[in-house]
From Swiss-Prot:
Organism from which the protein derives: Ictidomys tridecemlineatus (Thirteen-lined ground squirrel)
Source taxonomy: Eukaryota, Metazoa, Chordata, Craniata, Vertebrata
Name assigned to this protein: Colipase
Alphabetical UniProt keywords: Digestion, Disulfide bond, Lipid degradation, Lipid metabolism, Secreted, Signal
Pfam families, per the entry: Colipase, Colipase_C
Disulfide links within the chain: C33-C44, C39-C55, C43-C77, C65-C85, C79-C103
MF annotations from Gene Ontology: enzyme activator activity; lipase binding
Amino acid sequence: MKVLVLLLVTLAVVYAAPDPRGILINLEDGEICMNSAQCKSSCCQHFSPLGVARCTRKASENSECSPKTLYGIYYKCPCERGLTCESDRTIIGAITNTNYGICLDAGRSKE
């Protein structure tokens, strides 16, 4: 019973005044991450298979992109809001995280 009370008090103290920056979530660009859900930008990217993943801003128009990831970490970030990642999507590419494309403005590309 004492352990439960101590645990509840500890949790109350931890959540009483959360840091807006965050330690595990709400990470800024450049901070080390393990999953895109931790980043404010929603993109956790690593530049090599052995490299450390860091939060990075999403891809801008005409930049390389990944449409989706199964693992939460990207080699190429998805597009900014309002853009679409035009790519050849394959099952193998989805598994190996190599379905790369280019960010295009959906409104302009249909004209």
